[in-house]
Amino acid sequence: MPDANEVKPKKGWSNPALRMMGIPRISLPSRNWMIFWTVVTTIGGGIAYDKYEQKQMRKKWMDAVKQFGEVSYGANEIPRKLSIFIAPPPNDFLDESLKLFRKFIKPVLNAGVVDFEIFSESRQGDIRASVAEKIRELRRKQLVEETPKKNESNGNQDNDEEELKSRSDLYKAKDVLGLYKVFPADINVKSEDAIDDSSAGGIICVGRGAYKEYLSGVHEGLLGPLEKPQSVIDEETKLAEEKKKEKEENPDKDDDNDEEQSNLKPVPLRYIKPEDYANAQLAPELDLSTVVKDDKGVPVFFEQPVYTFPLPNLVGFTNIPRKIYRYFTKRFLVDDFGERTATIVNNKSRPFVYKDVLMAKEEEMDWPKKWVEKGKERNSEWVQELEHDERVTSRMKVFE
C-alpha cells in the first residue's frame, strides 16, 4: 500500500541527453506562476503595442507635412512663427502640459519647419495680463507717434538744453573698423509672415484655461483703458491688505508654494469687466480699418489665426479606471493631436464664428468638481463663462 506522505513525481517531459547535462525535467509552471506571467505579458504587450502605434501615428503626420520641410529659405529669410500659450491643468503642474506639447505637438511642427515661441504661466491670469499689456503697449506706441512733440511744434526755440544721443545712434562698430568693409552691407531679414497677411503666424493655446485667458486678454487690451483705473487700484490694495492680515493671523499655514507665490508680483486685475465690453470704445489709437502690423510688416498676434488643444488630464481616485484606459490608448491621442497640428501647419483658416468661443469646451468635463467649486468661491477666471464682443472676434480667425 503506497505511503500517504509519498509525493508523486511531477509530470513532464525529459530527455536522457538533457538529464546527463544537468537540465531538469521540462514541465509547465504552476497555476500561480501561469497567472503571474499571463498578467505581466498582457500588460507589457499592451504597453509595447501602444507605444509602437504611437510612433507610427507620429510618423504618419510628420510625413504629411514633410513637404514644408523641403522648402529652402535664403540667408535673409525666416520661416513662419507661431505664438504658443501653455497653461497647467487644473489642480496639477505645468510640466504635464509641457510634456503633452513636447510629445504630441512639437514633432509635427518641427517636421513642417514652423518656428514657435512659448509663453507659459504658473498662476491664473498671467497669460491674460501679458496679452492685454502687449496690446496696450501697441496702443501707447501708436499714440506717441501720432502726437506731435512739443519741441517740434515750437521749432525747438525754447529748448536750450543740450540733446544727448547714445553712441549707437551716432555710429556703429563697422563705421570705425576697416575690417567690416570686406563684408556685405546689412542683411535685410524678411519674415514669411510678412508676405501674406491672411496666412501670417498663428496662435496655439494648450488648454481651455489658456484659451480663456488669451481671449479675455485680447478683449481687455482692445476695449480697456490704457492706464489702470482707480477702482482697480483700490481693489488690488484691498486684496493685498486682506492677504497680509490673513498671513499674520495664520503664520503656520504657509507652505513652500505660498512662499514662492508671495515672492512674485500679484497678477494684475482686469482693467475692464466683461459686462462693460458693450459700452467700451474699440482701441481708438489703432487704425482698425486695415490689418494692424508691427514694425517688420507682420500682422500683430491678435490678427493671426488661433487654435486650442484640450488637455486630457484626469485627477482623483474615482477616475482611476478612465486613467488606466487612456494610458493604454495614447495612440488615439497622438493621432488626434497630430491631425490637429497638421491642420495648423497647412495654414488654412476661416473667420471666427460664435461656436469658436467653445473651443476645447470638452476639457471642462474632466476638471475636478471640488476644484471648480473652490474656483467659483474665489471668482476664478477659468470657471466663469467666456464673454466676448463681436467687434473684437470679427477681426479674429481660427485654423480649420
From Swiss-Prot:
Q: Where is the composition biased (Acidic residues)?
A: 251-261
Could you tell me which residue ranges are on the Mitochondrial matrix side of the membrane?
1-32
Q: Which domain of life is it from?
A: Eukaryota
Keyword match GTP-binding: no
Region: Disordered, residue numbers: 143-166, 240-266
Keyword Protein transport in annotation = yes
Q: What is its main location?
A: mitochondrion
Which portions of the chain have biased composition (kind: Basic and acidic residues)?
143-152, 240-250
Q: Name one Pfam family in it.
A: Tim54
Compartments (UniProt record): Mitochondrion inner membrane
Q: Which InterPro entries match?
A: Lipid_Phosphate_FormReg, Mt_import_IM_translocase_Tim54
Instruction: Fill in the subunit field for this protein.
Output: Component of the TIM22 complex, whose core is composed of TIM22 and TIM54, associated with the 70 kDa heterohexamer composed of TIM9 and TIM10 (or TIM8 and TIM13).
Q: What does this protein do?
A: Essential component of the TIM22 complex, a complex that mediates the import and insertion of multi-pass transmembrane proteins into the mitochondrial inner membrane. The TIM22 complex forms a twin-pore translocase that uses the membrane potential as external driving force.
Return the protein name.
Mitochondrial import inner membrane translocase subunit TIM54
Species name: Candida albicans (strain SC5314 / ATCC MYA-2876) (Yeast)
